[in-house]
Curated annotation (Swiss-Prot):
Role: Plays a critical role in recombination and DNA repair. Helps process Holliday junction intermediates to mature products by catalyzing branch migration. Has replication fork regression activity, unwinds stalled or blocked replication forks to make a HJ that can be resolved. Has a DNA unwinding activity characteristic of a DNA helicase with 3'-5' polarity.
Full protein name: ATP-dependent DNA helicase RecG
Subunit structure: Monomer.
Residue stretches making up the Helicase ATP-binding domain: 285-453
Gene coding for it: recG
Intervals of motif DEAH box: 399-402
Amino acid sequence: MLIGEIKEPVSVLKGTGKVVLAQLERLNISTIGDILSYWPRLWEDRTQEQMFSQWTLAHRLQVRVSVTAHCWFGFGKSKTLKLVVQDGQGCVAELLCFRRNFLHFMFPVGSEAVVYGSFYEKDGLLESSSFDIEKIDCIEKKILPVYPLTKGLKQMKLRMLICAAMDQWIGTVDSELPKPILEKYHLLTKRDVLLSMHTPRTLDDVAKGKHSLIFEEFFSLQMTIGMRSLQKRGRLPLTQGESDQQSAIPSVVSELSLLQKKLHRCLPFELTVDQKRVITEITQDLEREEPMARLIQGDVGSGKTLVAFFSCLKIIEQGGQVALLAPTELLARQHADTAARLLAPIGIRLAFLTGNVKSEGRAYLLEALVAGEINLVVGTHALFSKSVRYHDLRLVIIDEQHRFGVLQRSALIQKGREGNPQGKTPHIIMMSATPIPRTLALSVFGDLDISIIKSMPGGRKPVITYIARKTKAEKVYEFVGNEIEKGRQAYFIYPRIHDIGLTDLKSVQCMYMYLKNYFARYAVAMIHSKMTEEEQQRIMKYFSEGTVHILVATSVVEVGVDVPNANCIVIEHAERFGLSALHQLRGRVGRGDVQSYCFLMHGDEMTECAKRRLKIMGSTADGFVIAEEDLKLRGPGDVGDTKNFEQSGYSGFRVADPVRDYPILQVAREAAFELLRKEKGSSEAR
């Protein structure tokens, strides 16, 4: 049977009283299957002996010693034993025996022992309070697993319980992976995995066991992803190789529909190679019977929205409706304004719907939607509220998709089914201005076809990034003033809205007053999330028109703000912002044909992680490189849509790491999809 099918309670093991059962419950261990698959977090190599001279802070030592003295420190009940020991080279160390004074009797002066532990240096001597000590004749040289614990539970007890479970049940365990997969990819059976993880003979055993477990976790997820895609679309997602082949499509102009050609002729610039390719990929998807599910990734300012509008026209020309969902009213308004500028002149009927649309206008808009008089509606979460109904919603475009939960996205998709005459699932395009690392793209977003826009519109110059201490603020302000004198505009970004007075963190409101006085000749405005949507829209309108020269803001301007004349952004307390946020904020400039500048101002004290973030920002402007580095710094659980994906079946990895184990992920994906293709072919043959 499979390990997860072993449902006997862990209480059948000897030595599991009420206290131990409660401890195991805190570790989510309630069955034999649970305890067998409770994997170690590391393994201690106790097969080799070292000398104290080989000590480093990063490693534990196993040393054969002789006890040379017993010392005591503290008074009364807190009196504690200190064992003084010496290795074969005469190097001395001290063992602080907190709550282990009984070692005084077990290891008298002159006795020999083997000590295993981590040491630190104090006053020229090595000391340890975290150690194991065994008599010479009792020592077993082996690889010991070390498990995550909970309060009161000891390693020795947990090891004993796991070994007892292994002795009784290991013979009943079958492998989750099919035998041909095990053989083709040289993987261990599940029984051998259990032996390699819990009772390894060598560290090589551990490596083989971990590799097989990692492959199994990735394979299981990719099978789920593949089956979901087959159910929804009748085909598997594109593999990396197939995506690369698609990227060879050189041109799109000849394949444009009538409305798309009209929009293309109106553009004052040429589409980039990547935009053309992605438009073709989407157009081909829209001509298929099964619903499209595609993620468009692009760096800041790469032109994803324009690609989405070209996609809209294909659907509208076929008589369908399109809904474009944005996470904030500010971003939704930006999209609506862009659509009005580009699509209204070629006859597209547009609407804008948010929670703030007044009742009279809202009633008319809802009637027009259900009557099919509106081709494209742009809005926020109001698009999937109960009162909104569609005539024939065939395409849903979700911008900044990571800001929406799976349930919210599903609600809008359900609206499409309800509003479709045949009850079909609408096509889905998700857009992300935060590049998603390839590692997460294959794991978390593996059931989507992925299009990548890397090439940037022509004529743009790379943003020059400066990293400076806060003491250089005056020079930075002076530089920005010179740029504004030339007719440019600037952003000043701060981590707080209000000055709370407990720290030296600058705030938007405080710096707005300061900068208004410093740049007295120019118009200075502020914007933050506590302002009403109407206030934010008014300020952004003034800034876009050039009436406001300097915008003091929080990260509310992180996405969706496109002002080509703004060429300076000053981010103060940059060490307080995440890598992704810094990259998005930097993307507010560099959108015109003039040289742009980003100033990352930091305080005197920074964590190592903050220093690393700023160093990365100074070394590259490639959003995909930054996304990979961000994933390394924060881990896969904190990046992208991982938590949202959990709602639809993703439960995370226990051993695998998509960053560290990316090569295994690629192989497991190919293996899973190959198996699904064979199964699909067999079922069709029948």
